[in-house]
Protein backbone atom coordinates (compact mmCIF):
# COMPACT_ATOMS: atom_id res chain seq x y z
CA UNK A 1 0.00 0.00 0.00
CA UNK A 2 2.89 2.38 0.78
CA UNK A 3 4.38 1.71 -2.67
CA UNK A 4 1.05 2.54 -4.31
CA UNK A 5 0.82 5.79 -2.38
CA UNK A 6 4.32 6.85 -3.41
CA UNK A 7 3.66 5.87 -7.02
CA UNK A 8 0.46 7.91 -7.19
CA UNK A 9 2.31 11.01 -6.01
CA UNK A 10 5.57 10.59 -7.93
CA UNK A 11 4.33 9.15 -11.25
CA UNK A 12 2.48 12.22 -12.59
CA UNK A 13 5.33 14.54 -11.59
CA UNK A 14 7.95 12.42 -13.36
CA UNK A 15 5.82 11.89 -16.47
CA UNK A 16 4.95 15.56 -16.85
CA UNK A 17 8.48 16.86 -16.27
CA UNK A 18 10.00 14.29 -18.65
CA UNK A 19 7.39 15.19 -21.27
CA UNK A 20 8.15 18.90 -21.09
CA UNK A 21 11.91 18.37 -21.19
CA UNK A 22 11.86 15.54 -23.74
CA UNK A 23 9.66 17.40 -26.22
CA UNK A 24 11.79 20.55 -26.19
CA UNK A 25 12.59 21.63 -29.77
CA UNK A 26 9.66 19.79 -31.30
CA UNK A 27 8.58 23.06 -32.92
CA UNK A 28 11.47 22.72 -35.40
CA UNK A 29 10.30 19.27 -36.48
CA UNK A 30 6.69 20.39 -36.85
CA UNK A 31 7.58 23.47 -38.89
CA UNK A 32 9.17 21.30 -41.61
CA UNK A 33 5.71 19.96 -42.47
CA UNK A 34 4.57 23.41 -43.60
CA UNK A 35 4.54 24.24 -47.32
CA UNK A 36 4.40 27.99 -46.89
CA UNK A 37 6.03 30.46 -44.54
CA UNK A 38 2.71 31.10 -42.77
CA UNK A 39 2.12 27.37 -42.29
CA UNK A 40 5.63 26.81 -40.98
CA UNK A 41 5.22 29.74 -38.56
CA UNK A 42 1.88 28.40 -37.29
CA UNK A 43 3.26 24.90 -36.81
CA UNK A 44 6.25 26.34 -34.98
CA UNK A 45 3.96 28.22 -32.59
CA UNK A 46 1.98 25.02 -31.99
CA UNK A 47 5.21 23.15 -31.33
CA UNK A 48 6.20 25.62 -28.61
CA UNK A 49 2.90 25.11 -26.72
CA UNK A 50 2.68 21.39 -27.45
CA UNK A 51 4.95 20.08 -24.59
CA UNK A 52 3.03 22.01 -21.96
CA UNK A 53 -0.39 21.05 -23.33
CA UNK A 54 0.72 17.42 -23.51
CA UNK A 55 1.89 17.52 -19.90
CA UNK A 56 -1.46 19.00 -18.84
CA UNK A 57 -3.27 16.27 -20.76
CA UNK A 58 -1.16 13.62 -19.00
CA UNK A 59 -2.25 15.04 -15.62
CA UNK A 60 -5.94 14.92 -16.56
CA UNK A 61 -5.66 11.42 -18.05
CA UNK A 62 -3.83 10.20 -14.95
CA UNK A 63 -6.58 11.57 -12.68
CA UNK A 64 -9.38 10.00 -14.70
CA UNK A 65 -7.49 6.71 -14.75
CA UNK A 66 -7.26 6.86 -10.95
CA UNK A 67 -10.96 7.69 -10.49
CA UNK A 68 -12.62 5.39 -7.98
CA UNK A 69 -9.43 4.70 -6.06
CA UNK A 70 -9.59 5.09 -2.30
CA UNK A 71 -6.37 7.10 -2.36
CA UNK A 72 -7.15 9.27 -5.37
CA UNK A 73 -6.44 12.38 -3.31
CA UNK A 74 -2.76 11.44 -3.43
CA UNK A 75 -2.98 11.27 -7.22
CA UNK A 76 -4.50 14.74 -7.13
CA UNK A 77 -1.61 16.11 -5.11
CA UNK A 78 0.87 14.43 -7.46
CA UNK A 79 -0.83 15.89 -10.56
CA UNK A 80 -0.91 19.29 -8.86
CA UNK A 81 2.82 19.08 -8.20
CA UNK A 82 3.41 18.07 -11.83
CA UNK A 83 1.32 21.00 -13.08
CA UNK A 84 3.25 23.36 -10.84
CA UNK A 85 6.55 21.97 -12.16
CA UNK A 86 5.33 22.41 -15.75
CA UNK A 87 4.38 26.04 -15.13
CA UNK A 88 7.71 26.62 -13.40
CA UNK A 89 9.65 25.28 -16.40
CA UNK A 90 7.58 27.44 -18.78
CA UNK A 91 8.19 30.48 -16.59
CA UNK A 92 11.95 29.89 -16.40
CA UNK A 93 12.27 29.37 -20.16
CA UNK A 94 10.28 32.47 -20.99
CA UNK A 95 12.15 34.51 -18.37
CA UNK A 96 15.52 33.49 -19.81
CA UNK A 97 14.33 34.36 -23.34
CA UNK A 98 13.13 37.80 -22.30
CA UNK A 99 16.26 38.47 -20.25
CA UNK A 100 18.39 38.09 -23.40
CA UNK A 101 17.00 41.28 -24.96
CA UNK A 102 15.55 43.10 -21.96
CA UNK A 103 18.14 45.86 -22.37
CA UNK A 104 17.10 46.44 -26.00
CA UNK A 105 13.40 47.14 -25.26
CA UNK A 106 12.49 50.62 -26.57
CA UNK A 107 11.69 53.28 -24.01
CA UNK A 108 8.02 53.53 -23.08
CA UNK A 109 7.31 49.94 -24.07
CA UNK A 110 6.80 47.12 -21.55
CA UNK A 111 8.70 43.90 -21.84
CA UNK A 112 5.43 42.09 -21.18
CA UNK A 113 4.38 42.90 -24.73
CA UNK A 114 7.12 40.55 -25.93
CA UNK A 115 5.72 37.52 -24.05
CA UNK A 116 5.37 34.46 -26.26
CA UNK A 117 1.68 33.71 -26.73
CA UNK A 118 2.34 30.05 -27.46
CA UNK A 119 4.14 29.65 -24.14
CA UNK A 120 1.29 31.46 -22.39
CA UNK A 121 -1.22 29.05 -23.93
CA UNK A 122 0.82 26.08 -22.73
CA UNK A 123 1.19 27.52 -19.23
CA UNK A 124 -2.55 28.24 -19.11
CA UNK A 125 -3.29 24.61 -20.00
CA UNK A 126 -1.00 23.51 -17.16
CA UNK A 127 -2.75 25.97 -14.83
CA UNK A 128 -6.18 24.54 -15.71
CA UNK A 129 -5.00 20.99 -15.13
CA UNK A 130 -3.53 22.15 -11.82
CA UNK A 131 -6.87 23.61 -10.74
CA UNK A 132 -8.63 20.35 -11.53
CA UNK A 133 -5.89 18.44 -9.71
CA UNK A 134 -6.39 20.64 -6.65
CA UNK A 135 -10.13 19.91 -6.73
CA UNK A 136 -9.43 16.18 -6.85
CA UNK A 137 -6.89 16.51 -4.04
CA UNK A 138 -9.46 18.24 -1.83
CA UNK A 139 -12.67 16.29 -2.48
CA UNK A 140 -11.42 13.09 -4.08
CA UNK A 141 -13.79 11.06 -6.23
CA UNK A 142 -16.57 13.60 -5.72
CA UNK A 143 -14.76 15.82 -8.26
CA UNK A 144 -15.94 13.55 -11.07
CA UNK A 145 -19.46 13.80 -12.45
CA UNK A 146 -21.79 10.97 -11.46
CA UNK A 147 -23.73 9.05 -14.08
CA UNK A 148 -27.31 9.84 -13.09
CA UNK A 149 -30.43 11.09 -14.87
CA UNK A 150 -30.89 14.81 -15.26
CA UNK A 151 -33.55 16.04 -12.85
CA UNK A 152 -36.11 18.57 -14.03
CA UNK A 153 -37.45 21.35 -11.85
CA UNK A 154 -40.00 24.07 -12.38
CA UNK A 155 -42.84 24.04 -14.90
CA UNK A 156 -41.60 20.93 -16.70
CA UNK A 157 -41.58 18.82 -13.52
CA UNK A 158 -44.75 16.93 -14.43
CA UNK A 159 -44.22 14.03 -12.04
CA UNK A 160 -42.92 15.96 -9.04
CA UNK A 161 -39.73 17.70 -7.98
CA UNK A 162 -38.79 16.06 -4.69
CA UNK A 163 -35.25 16.82 -3.61
CA UNK A 164 -32.96 16.40 -0.62
CA UNK A 165 -32.67 19.08 2.02
CA UNK A 166 -29.57 21.18 1.47
CA UNK A 167 -27.00 21.46 4.22
CA UNK A 168 -27.74 25.14 4.90
CA UNK A 169 -31.38 24.36 5.70
CA UNK A 170 -30.25 21.36 7.75
CA UNK A 171 -27.97 23.60 9.82
CA UNK A 172 -30.87 25.93 10.57
CA UNK A 173 -33.21 23.06 11.48
CA UNK A 174 -30.70 21.06 13.53
CA UNK A 175 -28.32 23.57 15.06
CA UNK A 176 -25.15 22.56 16.86
CA UNK A 177 -26.58 23.98 20.10
CA UNK A 178 -29.04 21.09 20.48
CA UNK A 179 -28.48 18.20 22.85
CA UNK A 180 -29.73 15.18 20.87
CA UNK A 181 -27.15 14.30 18.22
CA UNK A 182 -28.80 13.50 14.87
CA UNK A 183 -25.80 13.22 12.56
CA UNK A 184 -23.11 15.13 10.67
CA UNK A 185 -23.63 17.93 8.18
CA UNK A 186 -22.31 16.43 4.95
CA UNK A 187 -23.56 14.28 2.08
CA UNK A 188 -22.02 10.82 2.27
CA UNK A 189 -23.19 9.94 -1.24
CA UNK A 190 -21.22 12.91 -2.63
CA UNK A 191 -18.10 12.27 -0.59
CA UNK A 192 -14.84 11.00 -2.06
CA UNK A 193 -15.35 7.56 -0.50
CA UNK A 194 -18.99 7.13 -1.58
CA UNK A 195 -18.15 4.23 -3.90
CA UNK A 196 -16.60 2.18 -1.09
CA UNK A 197 -18.30 0.39 1.79
CA UNK A 198 -17.84 1.85 5.25
CA UNK A 199 -15.42 -0.06 7.45
CA UNK A 200 -15.03 0.98 11.06
CA UNK A 201 -11.46 -0.35 11.18
CA UNK A 202 -10.34 1.39 7.97
CA UNK A 203 -10.03 5.20 8.25
CA UNK A 204 -9.54 5.42 4.50
CA UNK A 205 -13.26 4.63 4.05
CA UNK A 206 -14.41 7.38 6.42
CA UNK A 207 -14.07 10.30 4.02
CA UNK A 208 -15.35 13.54 5.57
CA UNK A 209 -16.96 11.60 8.41
CA UNK A 210 -15.78 12.80 11.81
CA UNK A 211 -14.64 16.20 10.52
CA UNK A 212 -17.99 17.75 9.57
CA UNK A 213 -20.17 19.88 11.92
CA UNK A 214 -22.82 18.14 14.01
CA UNK A 215 -26.56 18.21 13.41
CA UNK A 216 -28.33 18.32 16.79
CA UNK A 217 -31.96 18.53 17.88
CA UNK A 218 -32.95 20.94 20.66
CA UNK A 219 -36.59 19.90 20.99
CA UNK A 220 -37.83 23.21 19.59
CA UNK A 221 -40.40 21.81 17.17
CA UNK A 222 -42.95 19.03 17.13
CA UNK A 223 -43.45 16.64 20.00
CA UNK A 224 -39.67 16.64 20.70
CA UNK A 225 -39.57 12.83 20.34
CA UNK A 226 -37.36 10.95 17.89
CA UNK A 227 -37.27 7.45 16.43
CA UNK A 228 -34.20 5.71 15.02
CA UNK A 229 -34.43 2.69 12.71
CA UNK A 230 -31.12 0.92 12.21
CA UNK A 231 -30.46 -2.69 11.31
CA UNK A 232 -28.43 -5.14 13.32
CA UNK A 233 -24.80 -4.05 13.54
CA UNK A 234 -25.81 -0.63 12.24
CA UNK A 235 -23.73 1.44 14.71
CA UNK A 236 -26.78 2.42 16.77
CA UNK A 237 -24.86 2.78 20.02
CA UNK A 238 -21.77 4.42 18.54
CA UNK A 239 -23.58 6.93 16.32
CA UNK A 240 -26.64 7.89 18.38
CA UNK A 241 -26.50 6.86 22.02
CA UNK A 242 -22.91 7.69 22.97
CA UNK A 243 -22.77 11.06 21.12
CA UNK A 244 -26.05 12.14 22.71
CA UNK A 245 -24.93 10.99 26.16
CA UNK A 246 -21.80 13.11 25.73
CA UNK A 247 -23.69 16.22 24.58
CA UNK A 248 -27.05 16.17 26.40
CA UNK A 249 -27.02 18.52 29.39
CA UNK A 250 -30.22 17.58 31.24
CA UNK A 251 -31.55 14.53 33.07
CA UNK A 252 -30.86 11.35 31.13
CA UNK A 253 -32.31 7.83 31.32
CA UNK A 254 -30.64 5.31 29.01
CA UNK A 255 -31.77 1.74 28.38
CA UNK A 256 -28.48 0.20 27.26
CA UNK A 257 -28.58 -3.56 26.56
CA UNK A 258 -25.01 -3.37 25.22
CA UNK A 259 -23.67 -2.10 28.59
CA UNK A 260 -21.23 0.11 26.64
CA UNK A 261 -22.56 3.62 27.13
CA UNK A 262 -22.07 4.22 30.86
CA UNK A 263 -18.34 3.33 30.91
CA UNK A 264 -17.73 5.61 27.93
CA UNK A 265 -19.51 8.72 29.22
CA UNK A 266 -19.13 8.22 32.99
CA UNK A 267 -16.20 10.59 33.56
CA UNK A 268 -17.48 13.23 31.16
CA UNK A 269 -20.91 13.51 32.76
CA UNK A 270 -19.42 13.30 36.23
CA UNK A 271 -17.18 16.26 35.37
CA UNK A 272 -20.33 18.16 34.38
CA UNK A 273 -21.62 17.84 37.98
CA UNK A 274 -24.02 15.03 37.16
CA UNK A 275 -24.95 12.28 39.63
CA UNK A 276 -24.59 8.94 37.87
CA UNK A 277 -26.69 5.92 38.82
CA UNK A 278 -26.18 2.62 37.02
CA UNK A 279 -28.83 -0.06 37.46
CA UNK A 280 -27.10 -3.34 36.69
CA UNK A 281 -28.25 -6.82 37.82
CA UNK A 282 -24.58 -7.74 38.20
CA UNK A 283 -24.19 -4.95 40.78
CA UNK A 284 -27.51 -4.93 42.68
CA UNK A 285 -26.21 -2.63 45.43
CA UNK A 286 -27.59 0.31 43.45
CA UNK A 287 -31.37 0.38 43.39
CA UNK A 288 -34.47 2.47 44.01
CA UNK A 289 -37.95 1.82 45.31
CA UNK A 290 -40.28 1.60 42.31
CA UNK A 291 -43.23 2.39 44.60
CA UNK A 292 -41.86 5.52 46.28
CA UNK A 293 -43.61 7.93 43.88
CA UNK A 294 -47.09 6.46 44.32
CA UNK A 295 -49.72 9.02 45.32
CA UNK A 296 -47.38 12.00 45.18
CA UNK A 297 -47.54 15.21 43.16
CA UNK A 298 -51.21 15.06 42.22
CA UNK A 299 -51.69 11.42 41.26
CA UNK A 300 -53.98 9.18 43.31
CA UNK A 301 -52.44 6.13 44.94
CA UNK A 302 -55.01 3.82 43.38
CA UNK A 303 -54.26 4.98 39.82
CA UNK A 304 -50.52 4.75 40.36
CA UNK A 305 -50.77 1.25 41.80
CA UNK A 306 -52.76 0.12 38.76
CA UNK A 307 -50.04 1.58 36.52
CA UNK A 308 -47.28 -0.38 38.28
CA UNK A 309 -49.27 -3.60 37.96
CA UNK A 310 -49.75 -3.00 34.23
CA UNK A 311 -45.99 -2.66 33.71
CA UNK A 312 -45.29 -5.93 35.46
CA UNK A 313 -47.88 -7.77 33.37
CA UNK A 314 -46.87 -8.25 29.75
CA UNK A 315 -49.22 -6.63 27.27
CA UNK A 316 -49.70 -6.49 23.54
CA UNK A 317 -51.11 -3.94 21.18
CA UNK A 318 -52.72 -6.69 19.10
CA UNK A 319 -55.74 -8.95 19.55
CA UNK A 320 -55.80 -11.78 22.09
CA UNK A 321 -58.04 -14.77 22.64
CA UNK A 322 -60.98 -14.38 25.01
CA UNK A 323 -59.67 -17.04 27.41
CA UNK A 324 -56.17 -15.54 27.53
CA UNK A 325 -57.59 -12.09 28.02
CA UNK A 326 -59.75 -13.22 30.94
CA UNK A 327 -56.91 -14.86 32.85
CA UNK A 328 -54.56 -11.97 32.14
CA UNK A 329 -57.11 -9.38 33.30
CA UNK A 330 -57.84 -11.40 36.43
CA UNK A 331 -54.13 -11.82 37.19
CA UNK A 332 -53.66 -8.08 36.69
CA UNK A 333 -56.44 -7.35 39.17
CA UNK A 334 -54.95 -9.80 41.68
CA UNK A 335 -51.53 -8.18 41.35
CA UNK A 336 -53.10 -4.73 41.73
CA UNK A 337 -54.83 -5.89 44.90
CA UNK A 338 -51.60 -7.24 46.41
CA UNK A 339 -49.64 -4.06 45.61
CA UNK A 340 -52.47 -1.99 47.07
CA UNK A 341 -52.47 -4.18 50.18
CA UNK A 342 -48.78 -3.46 50.74
CA UNK A 343 -49.18 0.29 50.16
CA UNK A 344 -52.66 1.07 51.49
CA UNK A 345 -53.80 -1.50 54.06
CA UNK A 346 -51.66 0.00 56.80
CA UNK A 347 -50.05 -3.17 58.15
CA UNK A 348 -46.79 -2.92 56.14
CA UNK A 349 -43.97 -0.68 57.37
CA UNK A 350 -42.90 2.14 55.06
CA UNK A 351 -39.47 0.66 54.39
CA UNK A 352 -41.05 -2.68 53.41
CA UNK A 353 -43.49 -1.22 50.91
CA UNK A 354 -41.62 -2.63 47.93
CA UNK A 355 -42.20 -4.99 45.03
CA UNK A 356 -40.03 -7.55 46.80
CA UNK A 357 -42.64 -7.69 49.57
CA UNK A 358 -45.43 -7.98 46.99
CA UNK A 359 -43.75 -11.00 45.45
CA UNK A 360 -43.20 -12.55 48.89
CA UNK A 361 -46.92 -12.23 49.61
CA UNK A 362 -47.85 -13.72 46.25
CA UNK A 363 -45.36 -16.59 46.21
CA UNK A 364 -47.26 -18.79 48.65
CA UNK A 365 -49.11 -22.07 48.16
CA UNK A 366 -52.59 -21.54 46.77
CA UNK A 367 -54.46 -22.46 49.96
CA UNK A 368 -52.33 -20.13 52.05
CA UNK A 369 -52.71 -17.32 49.50
CA UNK A 370 -56.49 -17.71 49.56
CA UNK A 371 -56.39 -17.44 53.34
CA UNK A 372 -54.28 -14.28 53.00
CA UNK A 373 -56.77 -12.80 50.56
CA UNK A 374 -59.62 -13.56 52.98
CA UNK A 375 -57.65 -11.90 55.78
CA UNK A 376 -56.96 -8.86 53.60
CA UNK A 377 -60.66 -8.56 52.80
CA UNK A 378 -61.58 -8.77 56.47
CA UNK A 379 -58.88 -6.49 57.92
CA UNK A 380 -57.74 -4.00 55.27
CA UNK A 381 -58.19 -0.30 55.98
CA UNK A 382 -58.68 0.47 52.28
CA UNK A 383 -61.98 0.07 50.43
CA UNK A 384 -60.02 -0.08 47.17
CA UNK A 385 -58.12 -3.13 48.40
CA UNK A 386 -61.28 -4.85 49.60
CA UNK A 387 -63.08 -4.30 46.32
CA UNK A 388 -60.19 -5.75 44.31
CA UNK A 389 -59.75 -8.74 46.63
CA UNK A 390 -63.45 -9.58 46.87
CA UNK A 391 -63.56 -11.30 43.48
CA UNK A 392 -61.03 -13.93 44.61
CA UNK A 393 -62.41 -14.81 48.02
CA UNK A 394 -65.00 -17.29 46.76
CA UNK A 395 -63.60 -17.96 43.30
CA UNK A 396 -63.71 -21.60 42.19
CA UNK A 397 -60.40 -23.43 42.73
CA UNK A 398 -59.99 -24.23 39.03
CA UNK A 399 -60.41 -20.61 37.94
CA UNK A 400 -58.25 -19.31 40.78
CA UNK A 401 -55.47 -21.71 39.76
CA UNK A 402 -55.38 -20.19 36.27
CA UNK A 403 -55.33 -16.66 37.64
CA UNK A 404 -52.69 -17.56 40.22
CA UNK A 405 -50.49 -19.21 37.57
CA UNK A 406 -50.59 -16.09 35.39
CA UNK A 407 -49.76 -13.77 38.28
CA UNK A 408 -46.86 -15.95 39.46
CA UNK A 409 -45.47 -16.27 35.96
CA UNK A 410 -45.46 -12.52 35.34
CA UNK A 411 -43.79 -11.72 38.67
CA UNK A 412 -41.30 -14.57 38.82
CA UNK A 413 -38.39 -12.23 38.04
CA UNK A 414 -38.96 -10.63 41.46
CA UNK A 415 -37.80 -13.92 43.00
CA UNK A 416 -34.28 -13.22 41.73
CA UNK A 417 -32.56 -11.25 44.52
CA UNK A 418 -30.47 -9.16 42.13
CA UNK A 419 -33.46 -8.20 39.98
CA UNK A 420 -35.70 -7.41 42.93
CA UNK A 421 -32.95 -5.29 44.52
CA UNK A 422 -32.94 -2.93 41.53
CA UNK A 423 -36.61 -1.95 42.08
CA UNK A 424 -36.72 -2.39 45.87
CA UNK A 425 -33.57 -0.55 46.91
CA UNK A 426 -32.91 2.75 48.62
CA UNK A 427 -29.75 4.14 46.97
CA UNK A 428 -31.72 6.96 45.38
CA UNK A 429 -35.32 7.97 44.75
CA UNK A 430 -37.30 8.96 41.69
CA UNK A 431 -37.28 12.54 43.02
CA UNK A 432 -33.58 12.76 42.11
CA UNK A 433 -34.36 12.29 38.43
CA UNK A 434 -37.10 14.93 38.47
CA UNK A 435 -34.67 17.38 40.10
CA UNK A 436 -32.65 17.32 36.88
CA UNK A 437 -29.22 16.52 38.33
CA UNK A 438 -29.25 12.72 38.06
CA UNK A 439 -28.60 10.35 35.15
CA UNK A 440 -29.69 6.72 35.17
CA UNK A 441 -28.16 4.03 32.97
CA UNK A 442 -30.17 0.80 32.83
CA UNK A 443 -27.61 -1.89 32.01
CA UNK A 444 -29.91 -4.85 31.43
CA UNK A 445 -28.40 -7.13 28.81
CA UNK A 446 -30.39 -8.37 25.83
CA UNK A 447 -30.88 -11.89 27.19
CA UNK A 448 -32.31 -10.60 30.47
CA UNK A 449 -34.41 -8.05 28.62
CA UNK A 450 -35.85 -10.81 26.46
CA UNK A 451 -36.82 -13.10 29.33
CA UNK A 452 -37.59 -10.53 32.04
CA UNK A 453 -38.90 -7.49 30.18
CA UNK A 454 -41.07 -6.63 33.18
CA UNK A 455 -37.95 -5.53 35.08
CA UNK A 456 -37.11 -2.84 32.51
CA UNK A 457 -40.77 -1.85 32.11
CA UNK A 458 -41.12 -1.21 35.84
CA UNK A 459 -37.92 0.87 35.97
CA UNK A 460 -38.75 2.99 32.93
CA UNK A 461 -42.42 3.30 33.84
CA UNK A 462 -41.59 4.46 37.38
CA UNK A 463 -39.29 7.20 36.11
CA UNK A 464 -41.77 8.32 33.45
CA UNK A 465 -44.68 8.47 35.88
CA UNK A 466 -42.60 10.19 38.56
CA UNK A 467 -41.99 13.05 36.10
CA UNK A 468 -45.45 12.90 34.54
CA UNK A 469 -47.20 13.29 37.91
CA UNK A 470 -45.32 16.52 38.60
CA UNK A 471 -47.33 18.20 35.83
CA UNK A 472 -44.33 19.92 34.25
CA UNK A 473 -42.75 21.09 37.51
CA UNK A 474 -39.35 19.61 36.71
CA UNK A 475 -35.96 21.18 36.07
CA UNK A 476 -35.37 21.26 32.33
CA UNK A 477 -36.24 18.23 30.26
CA UNK A 478 -35.58 14.57 30.90
CA UNK A 479 -34.41 12.54 27.91
CA UNK A 480 -35.37 8.85 27.83
CA UNK A 481 -33.06 7.11 25.38
CA UNK A 482 -34.35 3.57 24.83
CA UNK A 483 -32.27 1.14 22.79
CA UNK A 484 -33.88 -2.15 21.69
CA UNK A 485 -37.19 -0.69 22.86
CA UNK A 486 -39.10 -3.43 21.03
CA UNK A 487 -37.96 -5.88 23.73
CA UNK A 488 -40.04 -3.99 26.30
CA UNK A 489 -43.25 -4.97 24.58
CA UNK A 490 -46.34 -2.81 24.63
CA UNK A 491 -46.25 0.01 27.21
CA UNK A 492 -49.19 2.37 27.41
CA UNK A 493 -47.15 4.89 29.40
CA UNK A 494 -44.90 5.34 26.35
CA UNK A 495 -47.96 6.25 24.27
CA UNK A 496 -48.98 8.74 26.96
CA UNK A 497 -45.50 10.26 26.93
CA UNK A 498 -45.62 10.36 23.13
CA UNK A 499 -48.84 12.37 23.07
CA UNK A 500 -48.35 14.62 26.10
CA UNK A 501 -44.70 14.31 27.10
CA UNK A 502 -43.61 17.68 25.75
CA UNK A 503 -45.87 19.47 28.25
CA UNK A 504 -44.42 17.48 31.15
CA UNK A 505 -40.75 17.82 30.19
CA UNK A 506 -40.33 14.32 28.75
CA UNK A 507 -38.36 13.63 25.56
CA UNK A 508 -38.27 10.15 24.04
CA UNK A 509 -35.70 8.76 21.62
CA UNK A 510 -36.37 5.15 20.72
CA UNK A 511 -34.31 2.76 18.62
CA UNK A 512 -35.81 -0.04 16.50
CA UNK A 513 -34.22 -2.36 13.98
CA UNK A 514 -37.09 -2.12 11.48
CA UNK A 515 -40.62 -0.84 11.04
CA UNK A 516 -41.82 -4.42 11.44
CA UNK A 517 -40.60 -4.44 15.05
CA UNK A 518 -42.71 -1.40 15.86
CA UNK A 519 -45.78 -2.81 14.14
CA UNK A 520 -45.40 -6.09 15.99
CA UNK A 521 -45.20 -4.25 19.31
CA UNK A 522 -48.10 -1.86 18.83
CA UNK A 523 -50.49 -4.05 16.89
CA UNK A 524 -50.21 -3.37 13.19
CA UNK A 525 -49.78 -0.70 10.57
CA UNK A 526 -52.37 1.76 11.88
CA UNK A 527 -51.05 1.68 15.44
CA UNK A 528 -47.46 2.22 14.29
CA UNK A 529 -48.50 5.14 12.08
CA UNK A 530 -49.41 7.09 15.23
CA UNK A 531 -45.74 7.09 16.18
CA UNK A 532 -44.73 8.42 12.77
CA UNK A 533 -47.29 11.20 13.05
CA UNK A 534 -46.11 12.20 16.53
CA UNK A 535 -42.33 12.04 16.12
CA UNK A 536 -40.41 15.26 15.52
CA UNK A 537 -37.73 13.39 13.57
CA UNK A 538 -37.28 9.85 12.26
CA UNK A 539 -33.92 8.47 11.19
CA UNK A 540 -33.26 5.45 8.96
CA UNK A 541 -29.79 3.92 8.62
CA UNK A 542 -28.21 0.55 7.84
CA UNK A 543 -31.53 -0.75 6.52
CA UNK A 544 -31.67 -4.44 5.56
CA UNK A 545 -35.45 -4.85 5.47
CA UNK A 546 -37.03 -4.48 1.97
CA UNK A 547 -40.34 -3.34 3.47
CA UNK A 548 -38.63 -0.53 5.36
CA UNK A 549 -36.65 0.41 2.24
CA UNK A 550 -39.88 0.60 0.24
CA UNK A 551 -41.43 2.86 2.88
CA UNK A 552 -38.42 5.20 2.75
CA UNK A 553 -38.56 5.36 -1.04
CA UNK A 554 -42.27 6.22 -1.05
CA UNK A 555 -41.88 8.83 1.68
CA UNK A 556 -39.04 10.61 -0.12
CA UNK A 557 -41.37 11.28 -3.05
CA UNK A 558 -41.11 11.36 -6.83
CA UNK A 559 -38.96 13.47 -9.10
CA UNK A 560 -39.03 14.19 -12.84
CA UNK A 561 -36.05 13.11 -14.94
CA UNK A 562 -35.16 13.70 -18.58
CA UNK A 563 -34.38 10.56 -20.55
CA UNK A 564 -32.53 10.34 -23.87
CA UNK A 565 -34.11 7.75 -26.14
CA UNK A 566 -32.51 6.49 -29.35
CA UNK A 567 -34.37 4.32 -31.87
CA UNK A 568 -32.87 2.71 -34.94
CA UNK A 569 -34.63 1.34 -38.01
CA UNK A 570 -33.11 -0.79 -40.72
CA UNK A 571 -34.51 -1.01 -44.24
CA UNK A 572 -33.31 -2.22 -47.62
CA UNK A 573 -32.47 1.34 -48.64
CA UNK A 574 -30.42 1.94 -45.51
CA UNK A 575 -30.77 2.63 -41.81
CA UNK A 576 -31.97 5.60 -39.82
CA UNK A 577 -31.58 6.70 -36.23
CA UNK A 578 -33.96 8.89 -34.26
CA UNK A 579 -32.99 10.55 -30.99
CA UNK A 580 -35.59 12.05 -28.65
CA UNK A 581 -35.92 13.34 -25.10
CA UNK A 582 -38.83 12.57 -22.84
CA UNK A 583 -39.82 13.17 -19.22
CA UNK A 584 -40.36 10.27 -16.84
CA UNK A 585 -41.15 9.76 -13.15
CA UNK A 586 -38.49 8.39 -10.84
CA UNK A 587 -38.38 8.02 -7.05
CA UNK A 588 -35.94 10.37 -5.37
CA UNK A 589 -34.29 7.21 -4.05
CA UNK A 590 -35.24 3.69 -5.06
CA UNK A 591 -35.64 0.83 -2.54
CA UNK A 592 -32.56 -1.01 -3.78
CA UNK A 593 -30.53 2.20 -3.38
CA UNK A 594 -31.70 2.43 0.24
CA UNK A 595 -30.49 -1.10 0.88
CA UNK A 596 -27.10 -0.24 -0.63
CA UNK A 597 -26.52 2.90 1.41
CA UNK A 598 -23.32 3.02 3.41
CA UNK A 599 -23.55 2.19 7.10
CA UNK A 600 -22.43 5.72 8.02
CA UNK A 601 -25.21 7.34 5.99
CA UNK A 602 -28.78 8.04 7.07
CA UNK A 603 -32.04 9.58 5.90
CA UNK A 604 -33.90 11.81 8.37
CA UNK A 605 -37.55 12.79 8.01
CA UNK A 606 -39.18 15.80 9.66
CA UNK A 607 -42.70 17.13 9.20
CA UNK A 608 -43.02 19.89 6.61
CA UNK A 609 -39.43 19.64 5.34
CA UNK A 610 -37.57 17.88 2.57
CA UNK A 611 -35.91 14.58 3.54
CA UNK A 612 -32.39 15.00 4.87
CA UNK A 613 -29.60 12.75 3.63
CA UNK A 614 -26.53 13.15 5.80
CA UNK A 615 -23.75 11.40 7.68
CA UNK A 616 -23.89 9.74 11.07
CA UNK A 617 -21.98 11.05 14.07
CA UNK A 618 -19.99 7.90 14.86
CA UNK A 619 -18.13 8.89 18.00
CA UNK A 620 -14.78 7.18 17.38
CA UNK A 621 -14.33 9.19 14.16
CA UNK A 622 -14.65 12.54 15.96
CA UNK A 623 -11.69 13.92 17.87
CA UNK A 624 -13.92 16.09 20.09
CA UNK A 625 -15.90 13.05 21.25
CA UNK A 626 -12.85 10.85 21.65
CA UNK A 627 -11.44 13.50 23.97
CA UNK A 628 -14.62 13.38 26.09
CA UNK A 629 -15.28 9.64 26.07
CA UNK A 630 -13.21 7.39 28.27
CA UNK A 631 -12.33 3.75 28.65
CA UNK A 632 -14.66 1.40 30.57
CA UNK A 633 -14.49 2.08 34.30
CA UNK A 634 -14.22 -0.55 36.99
CA UNK A 635 -17.42 -2.17 38.16
CA UNK A 636 -16.88 -0.93 41.67
CA UNK A 637 -17.15 2.73 40.70
CA UNK A 638 -20.82 2.80 39.78
CA UNK A 639 -22.31 5.59 41.85
CA UNK A 640 -21.33 9.11 42.70
UniProtKB/Swiss-Prot annotation:
It is a multi-pass membrane protein. CDD domains: TrwB_TraG_TraD_VirD4. It comes from the Bacteria. Keywords: Cell membrane, Conjugation, Membrane, Plasmid, Transmembrane, Transmembrane helix. One of its GO terms (cellular component) is plasma membrane. The chain crosses the membrane at residues 6-26, 46-66, 70-90, 120-140, 215-235. The keyword DNA-binding does not apply. The keyword Membrane applies. Its main location: membrane. Coiled coil: none annotated. It is found in: Cell membrane. Gene3D superfamilies: P-loop containing nucleotide triphosphate hydrolases. InterPro entries: P-loop_NTPase, T4SS-coupling_protein, Ti-typ_conjug_TS_TraG-like, TraG/VirD4. Belongs to the VirD4/TraG family. This is Probable conjugal transfer protein TraG.
